[in-house]
């Protein structure tokens, strides 16, 4: 491995948003170096700060030392194991104590029928380039969404010359589908991986879906569907127009390039945060986020009480005065 003196110093990290930076690494060895992490690859050693790093994505061909993982955890950095270009999400390791505030907001919106419907309508509205008319029912919006999707397929079929006979694939016989359907399915898996990574990294649950339900990745499907018409559909049709060979591999490459150029990961993060704003849910600062070592609160009928406190006196039945909520 090259000496540290020849290292590049990665001072500027890409960000989901202000305060949460991320780094994607593949075909490299990650070690603890000089108070941060060192990334050894074919180009040499790159030093990356840890204090400002929110998420480290480890792609194919990556190894990481125990010392590096420990340092990342101590600094509150999430480590995620993903596929090439974040095409799939495999596992994660959470650094230090993380706030559950965003998950709570998602869960409250999911459990309240009125808020649930509002989030569903927001998700549908985000798919359209023009504002939807006021007063539409959910059934009417679903109908408009179906028309939008069919129009997207028809448009790219015309522009690329690739015949389109409808969305069709057989889970038991992958090769039975035509090339463009295989490209769409392979590309969708890529998009799901990216959405999964964004959701988990920001502290939301992939299981609590609003439009989609019943699956552990329901919310992943909700979010990925926002970007299919802009990214997946054109990439699939263009890939097949170039050649019908190896469309699965080539569409993933095309999607990766389009996603990087369009900074889609950052856009996903902003869309996720905006989705739950303005719902009348508490917006106050979360003390756990400010101090990750601070104990969480304890549930109580009157609200939350302070955690990390020994309640109860020396005598049976004697209780210490509980601190104010």
UniProtKB/Swiss-Prot annotation:
Co-factor(s): Mg(2+); Mn(2+)
Q: What class of enzyme is it?
A: hydrolase
One Pfam family this sequence matches? Cas_Cas1
Q: Does the keyword Phosphoprotein apply?
A: no
Q: GO MF terms on file?
A: DNA binding; DNA endonuclease activity; metal ion binding
Enzyme Commission number(s) from the entry: 3.1.-.-
Which keywords annotate this record?
Answer: Antiviral defense, DNA-binding, Endonuclease, Hydrolase, Magnesium, Manganese, Metal-binding, Nuclease, Plasmid
Going by the entry's taxonomy, the superkingdom of the source organism is recorded as: Bacteria
Residues the record lists as binding Mn(2+) = 145, 212, 225
**Region Disordered: which residues?**
283-325
Keyword Magnesium listed: yes
Listed InterPro entries = Cas1, Cas1_I-E, CRISPR-assoc_Cas1, CRISPR-assoc_Cas1_C, CRISPR-assoc_Cas1_ECOLI, CRISPR-assoc_Cas1_N
Whom does it interact with, and what assembly results? Homodimer, forms a heterotetramer with a Cas2 homodimer.
Family matches, as HAMAP family:
Cas1 (MF_01470)
Please describe what this protein does: CRISPR (clustered regularly interspaced short palindromic repeat), is an adaptive immune system that provides protection against mobile genetic elements (viruses, transposable elements and conjugative plasmids). CRISPR clusters contain spacers, sequences complementary to antecedent mobile elements, and target invading nucleic acids. CRISPR clusters are transcribed and processed into CRISPR RNA (crRNA). Acts as a dsDNA endonuclease. Involved in the integration of spacer DNA into the CRISPR cassette.
Q: Which family does it belong to?
A: Belongs to the CRISPR-associated endonuclease Cas1 family.
Q: What is this protein identified as?
A: CRISPR-associated endonuclease Cas1 2
Native source species: Thermus thermophilus (strain ATCC 27634 / DSM 579 / HB8)
């Amino acid at each position: 491995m090259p000496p540290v003196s020849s290292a590049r110093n990665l001072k500027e990290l890409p960000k989901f948003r202000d305060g949460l930076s991320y780094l994607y690494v593949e075909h490299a060895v990650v070690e603890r170096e000089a108070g941060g992490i060192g990334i050894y690859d074919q180009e040499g050693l790159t030093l990356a700060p840890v204090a400002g790093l929110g998420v480290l994505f480890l792609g194919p061909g990556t190894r990481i030392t125990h010392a590096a993982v420990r340092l990342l955890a101590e600094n509150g950095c999430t480590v995620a194991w993903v596929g090439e270009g974040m095409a799939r999400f495999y596992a994660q390791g959470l650094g230090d104590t993380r706030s559950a505030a965003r998950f709570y907001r998602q869960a409250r919106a999911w459990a309240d029928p009125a808020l649930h419907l509002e989030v569903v309508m927001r998700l549908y509205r985000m798919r359209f380039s023009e504002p939807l008319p006021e007063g539409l029912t959910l059934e009417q919006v679903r109908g408009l969404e179906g028309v939008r999707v069919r129009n997207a397929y028809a448009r790219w079929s015309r522009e690329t010359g690739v015949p389109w006979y409808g969305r069709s694939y057989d889970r038991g016989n992958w090769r039975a589908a035509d090339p463009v359907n295989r490209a769409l399915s392979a590309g969708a898996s890529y998009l799901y991986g990216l959405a999964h990574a964004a959701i988990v990294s920001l502290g939301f649950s992939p299981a609590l879906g609003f439009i989609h339900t019943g699956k552990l990745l329901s919310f992943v499907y909700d979010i990925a569907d926002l970007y299919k018409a802009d990214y997946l559909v054109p990439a699939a049709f263009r890939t097949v127009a170039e050649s019908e060979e190896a469309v699965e591999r080539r569409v993933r490459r095309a999607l990766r390039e389009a996603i990087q150029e369009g900074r889609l990961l950052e856009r996903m993060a902003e869309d996720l945060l905006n989705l739950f704003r303005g719902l009348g849910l508490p917006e106050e600062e979360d003390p756990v986020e400010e101090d990750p070592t601070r104990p969480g609160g304890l549930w109580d009928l009157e609200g939350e009480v302070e955690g990390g406190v020994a309640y109860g006196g020396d005598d049976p039945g004697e209780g210490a005065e509980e601190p104010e909520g």
